[in-house]
Amino acid sequence: MSEHYYSEKPSVKSNKQTWSFRLRNKDFTFTSDSGVFSKKEVDFGSRLLIDSFEEPEVEGGILDVGCGYGPIGLSLASDFKDRTIHMIDVNERAVELSNENAEQNGITNVKIYQSDLFSNVDSAQTFASILTNPPIRAGKKVVHAIFEKSAEHLKASGELWIVIQKKQGAPSAIEKLEELFDEVSVVQKKKGYYIIKAKKV
């Protein structure tokens, strides 16, 4: 089987790189590595999701599903210091990098842990917002499972924020979300990427 960034234990040889990137008007230092998604820069889709995200009206934590080396969760943790940001990824190397990046950016209001989808998320835990740049290459079944589990783990009036390219299935993603959520809207479109917000009322 060929290896992907959504593999649990990447076997590709480690080749760490450290670089700086500006997100939400703040400078961050990230260390990335082989075997994680978009290792040389914060990818356009994640940047668009980070820039588009608005703090939820409801109180509570925020969950970053498929956190990679951490740009989404850490940039939001830096902005919303009174909230705890949970960051999960199936990829053990990604989880290690996220922890390293939290430390080198002085971010403490995070809980970062390995989880295959929501397998290690407390079944009773609910969040004010969940964000994901879903692993499209893992297949529609996995992406839809993220949507389904997100619906279960959101508070009342909580929101799921997603970035997905039109060519990678944004229209079918919207259809699936409309089955699960009360309000679904496209809040941003840019260069073929959609930012979709799905809300539980």
Swiss-Prot record:
Pfam families: MTS (PF05175)
Gene Ontology BP terms: rRNA base methylation
Gene3D superfamilies from the UniProt entry: Vaccinia Virus protein VP39
Listed InterPro entries: RsmC/RlmG (IPR046977), SAM-dependent_MTases_sf (IPR029063), Small_mtfrase_dom (IPR007848)
Keywords: Methyltransferase, Transferase
GO molecular function per UniProt: rRNA (guanine-N2-)-methyltransferase activity
Family assignment from sequence similarity: Belongs to the methyltransferase superfamily.
Name of protein: Uncharacterized protein YbxB
Record gene name: ybxB
